[in-house]
UniProtKB/Swiss-Prot annotation:
Domain ULD stretches: 631-659
Name assigned to this protein: Ubiquitin carboxyl-terminal hydrolase BAP1
Keywords for this protein: Chromatin regulator, Cytoplasm, Hydrolase, Nucleus, Protease, Thiol protease, Ubl conjugation pathway
Cellular localization per UniProt: Cytoplasm; Nucleus
Compositionally biased region (Low complexity): 396-412
InterPro entries named in the record: Papain-like_cys_pep_sf, Peptidase_C12_UCH, Peptidase_C12_UCH_sf, UCH_C
Keyword Iron-sulfur: no
Source organism: Branchiostoma floridae
Assembly and binders: Component of the PR-DUB complex.
Length: 694
């Protein structure tokens, strides 16, 4: 068994199929062409191919310093899987097994699992013999090797004997106990390259080590003709893309369900979402009382904010109030007000989503705080307590006039901030909504992260927040696991949140309101990637109503189970101090949902194309492997027999020999007819005669 091992080529497809034959799942091998480019996904180890004879000479020139890094401690050596190569032509399998058996995250399968447990605690020599005594490994190795010719070819004069004596060798680089090791089956012990830095990945350490090694090897006398090959053992790309594709399809279904729910409510209430047809600051004839809507209280920040009121024409019924008076008529369609910080990165400061029925019961503002609250020009724009305090301020003014200058002046008197005057035309211009625009939110590039629907305003536990991730869906690579809870918070990097506030003095319950929010839960250092939850409050799906004495401030989705204090109170204090909460939600309009759906569809198409490419690549690996391992002797013998039976073989042989003779004659004639040489000879002879005459 130990005498029949064949040589293997350095090909990523061959090693990938060899891994599958070993019974290992979720692993593939990729070739590395550029050391400076990062590798997507987790890297389990590296396999390095070099010309062994030249490598040995170059290391001998450098000096015996490499021997100082040998690990001779038996406990350390026997604890890892390091086997000496005792079988010829088995270095490729040795290097691959050294990576697979030293990585606990890999699913090894029955064959390698049995080998790993059987050789536990053995020395390198015993492990080397154990590899040769596993018939499954030997069969898998030889099944991907090129068959040896039965008859040795005639000696070719064009190949030197020195070149034929050179051999190539495989070694592996793995990590064990936070240290980088080089495992060479021809060495007696592993080579320890030491730990890597605290703030770097182990692949950066390997990049420096392998670059230094290649530099030392190419610095020799014959180093220019040394050929290297580097391969990385990574996670299976097909499984990664399949997982990502399933997540994207789940997110698409969630968004579709959200749109169906929004559409169902809109059908019942005759609410229509359409393109912007008219933009005005104060709609004539339809101005509500200030104590019934906090939107107009926000207009006191008009000196620094741009407000676009998107209004759709519908009938305007009168709405009775609880105190017997009548509220000024409002349109029975959806009216949304977007108040945006002028020139601040495209982040929405305040966003109100107001859904009105033919009988208005409640107007619920949703607040979005700025992304960075430590900037002076933003902290002055945020009220200390938007919910209850803004209601008192709005109630203090009896009516809201139709002049934006009056609203801004009242804001300056309240907060002590003297705003610069703005022309009303700047707000009333029909293109104001286009200038403000439906700004691209930072979450729209993360469609590949999990979404989930929560119906109702009940206390729903959510993962603790942490730093914001700005990776797009296409840059995530292999990180698709669920978010991990973390207590780490970031005071500098926060994202906006939608909040639903019930104002005091309103004895009526909340109206049937559907609120679509995207909740982002962020992980801390060492945790998983951020995830998103799509929260939908639907009255038809057991939406919890708020009583007359209830007041929900902040994000109701962020309230943890229990008393509801703790993090919520800390976040509220931070909000009162001019800060923003780190764990927040985004308010969605149907247009936003449609844009999100479009982005998810685009990501699905990209992911499907990548998955298709990986599947085609795997098929190509199998085709190349069949071409490599197929024995063509029987086919060639049968073809020559058929030619001989038809009398064509002798003619082809004579024709081939004749062509070779003609080529030889023509080459000889060309060598004899060298005109430049004759001219030189004539010139030399004439010079000799001239000298003699002189």
């Amino acid at each position: 068994m130990n005498k029949g091992w064949l040589e293997l080529e350095s090909d990523p497809g061959l090693f990938t199929l060899l891994v599958e034959d070993f019974g290992v799942k979720g692993v593939q091998v990729e070739e590395i062409y550029d050391l400076s480019k990062p590798i997507e996904g987790p890297v389990y180890g590296f396999i390095f191919l070099f010309k062994w004879s030249e490598e040995r000479r170059s290391r001998r020139k450098v000096g015996p310093s490499m021997e100082e890094s040998f690990v001779v401690d038996e406990d350390i050596v026997n604890d890892m899987f390091f086997a000496q190569q005792l079988i010829p032509n088995s270095c490729a399998t040795h290097a691959l097994l050294s990576v697979l058996l030293n990585c606990p995250q890999i699913s090894l399968g029955s064959t390698l699992t049995r080998l790993k447990y059987f050789t536990r605690g053995m020395g390198p020599e015993s492990k080397g013999w154990a590899i040769g005594n596993v018939p499954e490994i030997a069969r898998a190795h030889n099944s991907h090797a090129r068959p040896e010719p039965r008859h040795l070819p005639e000696k070719q004069t064009g190949i030197s004997s020195v070149r034929t004596a050179e051999a190539f060798h495989f070694v592996s680089y793995v990590t064990t106990n936070d240290r980088l090791f080089e495992l060479d089956g021809l060495k007696p012990y592993p080579i320890d390259h030491g730990p890597w830095g605290e703030k770097e990945d182990w692949t950066e350490k390997f990049r420096r080590v392998i670059s230094e090694r290649i530099g030392n090897a190419t610095g020799g006398e014959n180093g220019h003709d040394i050929r290297f090959n580097l391969m990385a053992v990574v996670a299976d790309r097909r499984q990664q893309y399949e997982t990502k594709l399933n997540t994207l399809k789940t997110n698409r279904q969630i968004v579709l369900e959200a749109l169906q729910q929004v559409g169902g409510v809109n059908t019942k209430k005759s609410i229509q979402y359409a393109e912007v047809s008219h933009v005005c600051l104060h709609p004539p004839k339809f101005v509500p009382c200030s104590d019934d809507c906090a939107i107009w209280d926000a207009l006191r920040y008009s000196s620094a904010l741009r407000c676009s009121l998107i209004q759709h024409g519908c009938e305007h019924p009168s709405i009775p109030r609880s105190d017997g008076s009548t509220l000024v008529s409002w349109p029975s369609c959806v009216t949304s007000v977007n108040i945006v910080v002028s020139g601040h990165l495209k982040y929405v400061l305040l966003c109100f989503s107001i859904i009105l029925d033919h009988k208005l019961e409640k107007l619920v503002p949703a607040r979005l705080d700025p992304i960075k609250v430590n900037e002076p020009h933003l902290t002055s724009l945020i009220p200390s307590a938007f919910g209850r305090e803004s209601h008192h301020k709005s109630k203090a003014s009896s009516t809201v006039t139709s002049s934006s200058a009056a609203a801004s002046s009242s804001a300056a008197g309240t907060d002590g901030v003297q705003p610069a005057e703005m022309k009303p035309d700047e707000f009333l211009h029909p293109d104001a909504s286009r200038r403000v625009g439906f700004l691209e939110m930072p979450w729209r590039s993360d469609e590949a992260r999990p979404l989930s629907i929560h119906t109702g305003y009940s206390k729903i536990p959510s993962p603790a927040p942490s730093n914001e991730s700005t990776d797009t869906a296409s840059e995530i690579g292999s990180a698709f696991n669920s978010p991990v809870r973390s207590a780490n918070r970031s005071a500098l990097q926060t994202i906006p949140e939608g909040s639903i506030t019930k104002q005091e003095g309103d004895t009526k319950t909340d109206a049937n309101i559907i609120t679509v929010c995207l909740k982002r839960s962020l992980s801390g250092e060492g945790g998983g990637p951020p995830a998103k939850r799509l929260h939908i409050g639907d009255p038809d799906m057991a939406l919890q109503r708020l009583g007359s004495g209830d007041s929900v401030e902040g994000d109701p989705m962020a309230l943890q189970g229990g008393s509801g204090t703790g993090d919520a109170q800390q976040d509220q204090h931070a909000l009162q101090a001019g800060g923003a909460r780190p764990n927040m939600a985004h308010a969605f309009a149907p247009k936003d949902l449609l844009a999100l759906l479009k982005n998810v569809e685009t990501e699905i198409q990209i992911c499907e194309q990548h998955l298709k490419d990986e599947i085609e690549k795997r098929k190509k690996y199998k085709v190349d492997d069949c071409r490599r391992t197929h024995n063509y002797d029987d086919f060639i013998r049968t073809f020559l027999r058929m030619l001989a039976e038809q009398g064509q073989l002798s003619k082809l042989v004579d024709q081939h020999v004749l062509v070779r003779r003609r080529q030889g004659v023509s080459v000889g004639r060309l060598h004899k007819q060298r005109k430049p040489d004759r001219r030189r000879k004539r010139a030399r002879v004439s010079d000799k005669y001239r000298r003699k005459k002189q």
